[in-house]
Amino acid sequence: MPASRGAIGDAIENLLDPIHAYFLHPELVRRATRACPVDVEFSVEAYQATVRYTESREGMTLLQRLTEGRRTVSWGRYRPPTQVQFGFEDDCGVQAMITVIFSPVDVQTTRPFACFSTRRGRLPAWLKRLAIIAFHRKVLSQDLAMLALQADQLEHFGRPNYQQGPVDMFGPLIWVGLQGQTLRSEQRRLRLFDQA
């Protein structure tokens, strides 16, 4: 994957942000017409933070339905200082997983290294590989453009004093993890888009 302009913490948070897919990747990763309710379980242990999302299939795009099959749960995991994982599960267990390790090139440039793993299925591996590359090329280009825009804005206006809301689950943990500190244990449940 190409290096991206943007601080390592911003790149990690971009990947783990549960809301950005609706705005940055409409119709690719999430439906643009409306957000469907998502039940969220958030768990923090000393050396990792995991969030599990349970959502109905009506919130999924056609591409997700084709590539993720009968997915029932998806999850994101942050392992300090720079590892992120995503998993997609169905009734038979983990169906697909993405592991990304972020490496700082300099203060404002980050290079991600990604590994995609899928369960053996009917499609040949070479076809799955081509589909994954084609789909993620567009998603990655959108993420890189947004990180560059964010870096430009931070350079021009300075780092803002963000207010933390209920869906800002990973932001504070990422900054703690990047400092080499132990994460503080926490358990939380919430529902996103309950009024959708």
Show the residue positions of the predicted features.
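C-terminal catalytic domain of Rieske-type non-heme iron oxygenases
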Residues: 1-196
